[in-house]
Amino acid sequence: MAHDMYPNSPPRLTPDLLLRGYMAGIFPMAEARDDDAVFWVDPRQRGVLPLDGVHVSRKLRRFLARTEWTLSLNQDFAGVVAGCADRDETWINDQIFDAYTALHAMGFAHALEVREDGALIGGVYGVAIGTAFFGESMFSRRPNGSKVALVALCAHLRRCGYTLFDTQFVTPHLATMGAVEISRDSYRAQLRAALSAKADLTARPLPRTPAQIRAPGPGQPRS
């Protein structure tokens, strides 16, 4: 995917700088875990996941109905970010980890956790401003772990009044869930509208189990 990159210059990432970046339509990344430099990314084609168009396959619906995993919100933000960074190649370096942890303490960054017998086995985290949620990364230590986290998050965002789920890019995994690419101009128009309204991720309780998620399936209304 074509995108423009802007090298970061001092000062280092701060919560305020992150918020201003998101509101301007850009986001930070690092080349690798051990590379302390950060650059800003502005994709020409932006990935979004329409909250009224999330695709949940019949197979995944059956899994949601029978699994005994549990869900939680903001119980282990650092653990979720660490899980997302725990891979051979990652764009999450120490500077990014610290900045998002600080943003979480301010109430702007959030994580949804998936647990099996109390152990963290999947999750997703991102930033919420207005009615926009900027998805940063997700991880899975069990098959379907990240899918369950994503479906749960999308359902929760919609119930809480969010209108824009920014996935930044569209991976094959996200495409199967309904993510699409839109132009930079279209994205920024949607972003402006989302930033002009308000929503609260804690306005509604998060379902405790995947079986309680109101997730649409093929041929079913997305209500």
Swiss-Prot record:
It catalyses: N-terminal L-lysyl-[protein] + L-leucyl-tRNA(Leu) = N-terminal L-leucyl-L-lysyl-[protein] + tRNA(Leu) + H(+); N-terminal L-arginyl-[protein] + L-leucyl-tRNA(Leu) = N-terminal L-leucyl-L-arginyl-[protein] + tRNA(Leu) + H(+); L-phenylalanyl-tRNA(Phe) + an N-terminal L-alpha-aminoacyl-[protein] = an N-terminal L-phenylalanyl-L-alpha-aminoacyl-[protein] + tRNA(Phe). Keywords: Acyltransferase, Cytoplasm, Transferase. Gene3D superfamilies: Leucyl/phenylalanyl-tRNA-protein transferase, C-terminal domain (3.40.630.70). One of its GO terms (biological process) is protein catabolic process. GO terms for molecular function: leucyl-tRNA--protein transferase activity. It is found in: Cytoplasm. The keyword Glycoprotein does not apply. Its EC number is 2.3.2.6. GO terms for cellular component: cytoplasm. Its main location: cytoplasm. The keyword Acyltransferase applies. It is an enzyme of class 2 (transferase). Functions in the N-end rule pathway of protein degradation where it conjugates Leu, Phe and, less efficiently, Met from aminoacyl-tRNAs to the N-termini of proteins containing an N-terminal arginine or lysine. Belongs to the L/F-transferase family. HAMAP family: Leu_Phe_trans (MF_00688). NCBIfam families: aat (TIGR00667). This is Leucyl/phenylalanyl-tRNA--protein transferase. It comes from Dinoroseobacter shibae (strain DSM 16493 / NCIMB 14021 / DFL 12). The gene is aat.
